[in-house]
Amino acid sequence: MINKGKNTIFTRKKRGIRKEQCTITTHKNLSVKIDYISIVFETATAEDIIMHILDLPTDIFNVYPAMIKFKTYQARWQIGDIYVSVDARKTEDNPQGLGCYLVMTGRGCDDIFRILDSRNYTFGDMFRRCERRYGLDNFHFTRLDIAIDDKNEKSY
């Protein structure tokens, strides 16, 4: 163990691999949160995502014609910074034109976190709903950002 004031560095050996663990602050000075999510659902509708994954009513969303570059979506359901892009064009690979693209920016993640938390749910519960409803082969994450905010007087 190396101790330099309040910063302590521990050296551990585990299964022959040397790992360094550096403790530079305490948990009370850090906050960690999900800051951006994007998920593609291969066989879903906007209504299904909104009602069964986000657990929100569809009538609070505004619907706009919108396109995403390099995607076949033609409409976007939106409330605040939560977006569900839908209405994929029918193609040979997708004859029913199904599929959605769920995006939550930082504020959208904060909003859905508050909603989940008020119902005693977590993001993990929401992700498990995705798995239960669509199976592992019918949805995938395209982006999942984590933000770590350091609230120390002196940042590390």
Model-identified regions with their sequence ranges:
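Structured, helix-rich domain cores that form ligand/interaction pockets
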Residues: 1-156
